[in-house]
């Protein structure tokens, strides 16, 4: 999960729009997913996917930055921000060397792990439960080529799922082989990796529900747009 890194970025004073751009992009575009994509779909589709994933993160982060959403971070993370600021200020005033900061750094890291561990377990359990109950052939029937609404349906169907990009690439390869348009399949992949109920369970530790809804709504809109653009650019 990218959540601990997201927390670290926020604690480090990095603007929230930049941290959101990281949160969106990091699960979508990574070396394993790109390698699998290259083998499954070739250079052209891989390049378009990688560029669109990066642009999705950049645009999503830029839009979310304009909303000034810091006030919607959870009380837990805001408490960590205050504590971190006080510690950093004291270290700078005293010129504390790095080796003497190590114990505090490890303590803070452990507090973050303890804070999100339960939510990680809940998210994984929810994803596993959904994987076990989805009927065979359901997704292919819902995302067939003749339906104009296939892209938003693909995104909605992906929300209960939970998987990383490397795990989902073989799945969308099967979808495409069974006639699902490539843009629709990739929208499903992006939503599975970047948007899901288990992901919301993880984010609840660091965000209020209002911020989660804003984040999910913004990213959903961009993923649906990306799916339609893919279907236009890579029409059969």
For the regions a language model picked out, list residue spans one by one.
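Membrane-interfacial helix-loop connectors
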Residues: 1-50, 131-211, 216
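Selected transmembrane alpha-helices and immediately adjacent juxtamembrane segments
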Residues: 51-151, 177, 213-236
């Amino acid at each position: 999960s990218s959540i601990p890194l997201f927390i670290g970025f926020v604690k480090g004073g990095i603007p929230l729009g930049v941290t959101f751009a990281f949160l969106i992009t990091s699960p979508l575009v990574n070396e394993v997913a790109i390698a699998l994509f290259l083998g499954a779909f070739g250079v052209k589709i891989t390049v378009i996917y990688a560029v669109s994933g990066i642009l999705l993160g950049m645009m999503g982060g830029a839009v979310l930055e304009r909303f000034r959403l810091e006030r919607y971070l959870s009380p837990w993370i805001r408490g960590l921000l205050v504590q971190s600021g006080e510690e950093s200020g004291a270290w700078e005033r005293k010129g504390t060397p790095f080796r003497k900061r190590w114990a505090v750094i490890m303590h803070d890291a452990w507090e973050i792990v303890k804070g999100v561990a339960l939510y990680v377990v809940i998210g994984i359990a929810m994803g596993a439960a959904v994987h076990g109950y989805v009927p065979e052939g359901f997704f292919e029937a819902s995302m067939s080529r003749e339906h104009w609404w296939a892209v938003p349906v693909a995104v909605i169907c992906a929300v209960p799922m939970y998987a990383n990009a490397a795990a989902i690439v073989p799945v969308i390869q099967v979808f495409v082989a069974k006639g699902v348009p490539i843009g629709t399949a990739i929208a499903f992949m992006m939503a599975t990796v970047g948007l899901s109920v288990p992901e919301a369970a993880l984010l609840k530790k660091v965000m209020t529900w209002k911020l989660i809804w804003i984040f999910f709504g913004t990213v959903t809109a961009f993923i649906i747009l990306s799916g339609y653009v893919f279907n236009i650019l890579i029409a059969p």
